[in-house]
Every structure is written in structure tokens, then in C-alpha cells.
């Protein structure tokens, strides 16, 4: 059993080292790719994404505002009628 531990440990260490080197190369390649993608998407999709987010926030604001108004009207009507 002891004779198998050293070669097994060596294989594991070499595997970890090669894996870390591959991850570093992959990260460098992804950085270069993201810079290229960022340049393409910022020209075409940047304004579209911004407009989409602004419209979404406006719609959410309108819905929340309407809910607050409805709740306020319901409470006021309840107090006027004396049902609360």
C-alpha cells in the first residue's frame, strides 16, 4: 500500500498543476474574448438594453404607484363608511 502512495501523490500533484495552468490560459482567452464582445455589444445592444431597463423600471413604478393609490382609496372608503 505504501508503495502506491508516492506515485499516486505524484500523479495527483501533476494533475493539479496542469489543471491550474489550463485554467490560467482559459481565463486569459476569456478576457480577450470579452473585450471583443464588449466592443461589439456596446455599439449595438447598449442603447437597447438601457431603454429596456428604463421602460421596465417605469412600468414597475407605475404598478406600485397604482397599488398604493388603490390601497389608499380602499382605506379612505372604509373609514368614511365606518366599516374599518
UniProtKB/Swiss-Prot annotation:
It comes from the Eukaryota. GO terms for biological process: defense response to fungus; defense response to Gram-negative bacterium; defense response to Gram-positive bacterium. Transmembrane segments: none annotated. Disulfide bonds join 78-84. It holds the Pfam family FSAP_sig_propep. Keywords: Amphibian defense peptide, Antibiotic, Antimicrobial, Cleavage on pair of basic residues, Disulfide bond, Secreted, Signal. Its main location: secreted. Expressed by the skin glands. GO terms for cellular component: extracellular region. It is found in: Secreted. InterPro entries: Frog_antimicrobial_propeptide. Residues 1-22 form the signal peptide. Residues 23-36 form a propeptide. Has antimicrobial activity against Gram-negative bacterium E.coli ATCC 8739 (MIC=6.3 ug), against Gram positive bacteria S.aureus ATCC 6538 (MIC=3.1 ug), methicillin-resistant S.aureus ATCC 43300 (MIC=25 ug) and B.subtilis ATCC 6633 (MIC=25 ug). Has no activity against fungus C.albicans ATCC 90028. Belongs to the frog skin active peptide (FSAP) family. Esculentin subfamily. This is Esculentin-1SIa. It comes from Odorrana ishikawae (Ishikawa's frog).
Amino acid at each position: 500500500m505504501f508503495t502506491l502512495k508516492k506515485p499516486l501523490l505524484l500523479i495527483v500533484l501533476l494533475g493539479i498543476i496542469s489543471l491550474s495552468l489550463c485554467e490560467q490560459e482559459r481565463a486569459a482567452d476569456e478576457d480577450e474574448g470579452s473585450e471583443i464582445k464588449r466592443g461589439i455589444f456596446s455599439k449595438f445592444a447598449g442603447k437597447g438594453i438601457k431603454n429596456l431597463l428604463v421602460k421596465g423600471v417605469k412600468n414597475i413604478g407605475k404598478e406600485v404607484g397604482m397599488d398604493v393609490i388603490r390601497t389608499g382609496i380602499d382605506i379612505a372608503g372604509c373609514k368614511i363608511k365606518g366599516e374599518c
